[in-house]
A protein has these predicted regions:
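Conserved SAM/AdoMet-binding glycine-rich loop
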Residues: 68, 84, 103-104, 373-517, ...
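N-terminal [4Fe-4S]-dependent radical SAM core
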Residues: 37-63, 73, 266-336
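Catalytic cores of alpha/beta
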Residues: 460, 525-540
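Conserved, mostly hydrophobic/aromatic
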Residues: 209, 367, 475, 549
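Glycine-rich beta-alpha loop elements in corrinoid/cobalamin-binding modules
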Residues: 73, 81, 100-287, 295, ...
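Terminal amphipathic helices with adjacent charged low-complexity linkers/tails
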Residues: 105, 234-260, 298, 362, ...
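Flexible glycine/acidic-rich beta-alpha junction loops that bind and position SAM and/or redox cofactors
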Residues: 128-137, 185-187, 217-222, 246-247, ...
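N-terminal pre-triad scaffold of radical SAM enzymes
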Residues: 18, 69-74, 89, 322-350, ...
């Protein structure tokens, strides 16, 4: 799927209440479905995890073990985090319910299925709620792809805090755990672009009991097991808690120290980034007299474990209560996830901080099985839109040292690590094997690829261009300035130009009219107006018009955001940072001839 987390900074995507009356069987009578419509809907939706008391009754459940709350609509698809964790918990024998996009003026939606026996899990959704609501220029967004009809306003600002307060009001004394991208990247003191301030750990502001950071399969399963057996919840890998002590932990600069010296945020962020990769020692950060104590990461799943998760009985559909389509589902409906993790380590990218740099790939057999399921679904037209992940052509890649004693910030920058074993030829054969399955007419790559890696295998590149580019290929050079690319930890721009030349040559060889869609960024820390003019000149020299240009958004937790906040590079050297909206808008406008960017009417052609 090409919904990369760093899509926020490479190509990314009215506070009002979304009432459940808009869903045809939701009742305002204490959250219980009533009448024939409710019964029919409950019967129809038994293949989904329950969202109402009527659906619980249809399963013969008197109570839930675990309640999961999400800022996204409920889509029973493995690309959506809360439903995936719900299916995993269900497989392990727990009774799980989901509340999707609850109203935040009352705890009624939260409480409609009753108090869960073990805990409530909360996620703001697939995006940080502030990023979901506001553009790079702090303007309100008018859409939300994770909501029926794509309508904005179905989740609150700072959703984890709001939902946690609702749970406390609905169920006093309930164990509350936060997860998902918002909680994961705000687990320690962080800069918040939307308030232009340093904020404390989300764990303190939300008053939750625990944060599960990163991919949460291990953490949430172990938490359920321990609460069931009455064991302490301390020491679970991949979790964050509040502690009176920091025993055995690596101490980060405190919240108060960062307030005094902004450069301390860079120090803390780089230590957190290294710990996410090395995964051997806990971290602790003082906030006043308390410590936010971060256990080592849970680690990447193995192939068999990953296969088992994606083979859970997902319907791959939105919950039947929704009357309108959910745009995010349409984007991934006919795609399959083949790989997790990304070795790129770009300084602005959230993936390495959430999924880690360690790569894990699914087996060909598991992917074949999932594609066979796609071919049996209503609406199937023969096209697998994507077989990928954060970086499609890193499927099957692995580290010869398994990441042990690795001090690199990236597996691919400044050049490809000699310990990284690429298997792009095997990936190409995987794609070909999928096209031979009954009912499959075509397989495409909707994810982005690393062009620097692709250049290392001419046969892969030839097969990619000749067979698996669906008209457009997404690449992320991000900029052309060597200095800016160094700050981004991105590949030399000359490699991008080499790739475009080979791509054009191979398109001619195969008689195909295909396009490269380059993703570029403005207003990155260290980027000047002159740098943007150079980039705009390059586009004009090729006869291209930028389609996917994103103004840098300082999302919590990344090295680039710390550079923005501190106005220095990762080594502490002062750099220019475009901070005012005017400066940022001016840089972005350079790509469009000094005008505000509109929807491009032409495509970049090779």
């Amino acid at each position: 799927m090409f919904m990369r987390l760093y899509m926020v900074n490479g190509c990314q995507v009215r506070m009002c209440s979304y009432h459940y009356q808009d869903r045809f069987f939701m009742s305002r009578n204490r959250g219980k479905g009533t009448g024939k419509a409710a019964c029919a809907a409950a019967s129809f939706s038994q293949s989904f995890l329950p969202m109402t008391r009527a659906e619980m009754d249809a399963r013969g459940w008197s109570e839930l073990d675990i309640l999961l709350i999400s800022g996204d609509a409920y889509v029973d698809h493995p690309a959506f985090g809360v439903p995936l964790l719900g299916r995993l918990l269900e497989k392990r024998g727990w009774r799980v319910g989901i509340v999707a996009q609850p109203r935040w003026d009352s705890p009624e939606d939260i409480s409609r299925m009753g108090r869960p026996r073990l805990f409530c899990g909360i996620s703001a959704g697939s995006l940080d709620s502030m990023l979901c609501h506001y553009t790079a220029f702090r303007k309100k967004r008018h859409d939300d792809p994770y909501t029926p009809g794509g309508k904005s306003g179905a989740r609150p600002n700072r959703a984890c805090i709001v939902y946690s307060n609702l749970v406390r009001a609905a169920f006093p004394g309930m164990f509350v755990v936060l997860g998902g991208i918002e909680a994961s990247l705000r687990r320690l003191a962080h800069y918040d672009f939307w308030s232009d301030s340093l904020r404390r750990s989300l764990l303190l502001d939300s008053k939750a009991d625990l944060i599960i950071y990163g991919m949460g399969e291990y953490g949430i399963s172990e938490l359920a097991r321990r609460l069931q057996s009455g064991e302490p919840t301390t020491g679970i890998a991949g979790t964050v808690r509040v502690s009176d002590q920091a025993e055995g932990a690596l101490l980060l600069p405190s919240y108060e120290e960062i307030l005094e010296d902004k450069r301390k945020l860079l120090e803390a962020t780089r230590l957190m980034e290294a710990a996410m990769h090395e995964g051997t020692r806990p971290l602790a950060q003082a906030h006043g007299r308390k410590f936010v104590y971060c256990e080592p990461p849970a680690g990447q799943l193995g192939t068999e474990q990953l296969d088992a998760i994606y083979e859970l009985p997902f319907t791959r559909l939105a919950h039947p209560s929704y009357r309108e389509p959910i745009p995010a589902l349409e984007m991934v409906k006919w795609s399959v996830t083949a790989v997790r993790g990304c070795g790129g380590g770009c300084s602005f990218c959230s993936i390495a901080l959430h999924q880690s740099r360690h790569l894990c790939s699914r087996s060909p057999e598991s992917l074949h099985q999932e594609v066979r399921k796609l071919t049996a679904m209503p609406g199937w037209k023969g096209m697998v839109s994507d077989v990928g992940g954060p970086t499609a052509n890193l499927w099957g890649a692995s580290c010869r040292l398994d990441g042990r004693n690795c001090q690199r910030e990236s597996c691919l920058y400044p050049e490809c690590c000699p310990q990284l074993q690429l298997r792009q030829g095997e990936y190409l054969e995987l794609l070909r094997s999928l096209t031979r399955l009954p009912g499959v007419k075509r397989v495409g790559i909707g994810s982005g690829i690393r062009f620097d890696a692709a250049l290392k295998d001419r046969r892969f590149l030839d097969g990619l261009v000749g067979e698996f580019v669906s008209g457009q290929l997404k690449l992320a050079p991000e900029h052309c300035s060597e200095r800016v690319l160094h700050l981004m930890r991105k590949t030399d721009f000359r490699l991008f130009e080499e790739f475009t030349g080979q791509f054009a040559s191979l398109c001619r060889k195969h008689g195909k009219e295909q396009y490269i869609i380059p993703y570029v960024m403005s207003a990155f820390p260290g980027c000047t107006i002159e740098d943007m003019q150079t980039l705009a000149t390059w586009f004009r020299s090729r006869g291209w018009k930028p389609q996917q240009a994103q103004c840098f958004i300082p999302t919590p937790g990344t090295v680039a955001t710390a550079m923005y906040y501190a106005e220095c590079d990762s080594r502490g050297k002062p750099i220019y940072v475009a901070k005012t909206d005017r400066e940022r808008e001016d840089q972005h406008a350079v790509l469009y001839g000094g005008k505000r960017p509109g929807r491009p009417k032409t495509r970049s052609r090779t």
